[in-house]
Amino acid sequence: METMSRRAVLAGLVAAAAAPALAQAKTNPRRIDVHHHSEPPFLLERTRAALLASSPYASDVVAWTPERSLDQMEQWGIETAIISNPTNWSALGADGNALCRRTNEYAARLRADHKGRFGFFGSVPLPDTDAALSEAAYALDRLKADGIGLVTSYGDKWPGDPLFDPLFAELNRRKTVVFIHPTAPGCCSRLIPGIPAPTVEFMFDVTRCITSMLFRGVFTRYPDIRFIFTHDGAALPMLADRITRNASVVRSAGFGSQEAAMRVLKKLHYDITTSTSRPALTALKTLVPVSQMLFGSDFPFLKPAETVPGLDKFGFSAAELNAINRGNAEKLFPPLRA
């Protein structure tokens, strides 16, 4: 009996020691963050002034280091962050294309130095279509990028413009994941004095971008591209009925009915970055199934603390949260599967 008692005590001690690890394994969501940014030092030399002038969060952005990302990832259960760099390369002058290449190579080294913690969307120097095609091939073939990152507009052109067709045709052939990040269009970056462009214009440019692509038939002509749009699709969920109704009567859009146009929007992917208020998530969940939602943080512009609490409190089931936090991204990025 004494021997059995000792065994029982030892077993109890082992179980007690393992309990915290088991609890962590059950609660750690192992998130995949599809909306995460890097700011390489060599690029900040060129963009620091513009960032400080345009973003209320620029002080955190210019202080970015990989270690800061990893610290936030540890705090918020993010296993892998897929980084992107939504820079206007053409605004950087003659060496913009070279800086784009250096940024892609930097991202590839970051992924190699921290295996399993980072992926990246390759940048391309649009609106130079030939250079963008060349850089996309380099990023995907040589650097093994997880996808390609674009922005919602380039000057006065949105991705529904024919300018983008050669790039989309190639990315469709490759069945690429394309992440499209908001920016302020040339017309509207200072539309309302005193209000930073990210406050409103970024959100409406996401909506303009999707609308331009829908009306031009981009999603139907390039069905093998998996598109990710940000911030719950911005104003799209609230305007989807109006947009698809109008798209259905514009002959060039190629839809025979509003329902056909709506089905296209429901197949797109949307990150829930910093858009986890009850009204925002309710609107998105009304538009698309949970299978189309992805986790994102927007670090270092914002922190996971701006997204996670609202997501956790919304009322998703455990299975739905697992899909948003990780499972849906695993389907888009098979190398990240556990």
Task: Label every PLM stretch briefly.
Residues 39-42, 88-91, 127-128, 156, ...:
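Active-site environment of divalent metal-dependent phosphoester hydrolases
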Residues 188, 195-214, 221, 226-338:
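H/E-rich (His + Asp/Glu) clusters that bind or coordinate divalent metals
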Residues 2-30, 34, 40-80, 106-112, ...:
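Mid-to-C-terminal alpha-helical segments outside catalytic/metal-binding sites
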Residues 45, 95-96, 241-245:
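A short secondary-structure junction motif
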Residues 35-37, 181, 231:
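Histidine-centered divalent metal-coordination motifs
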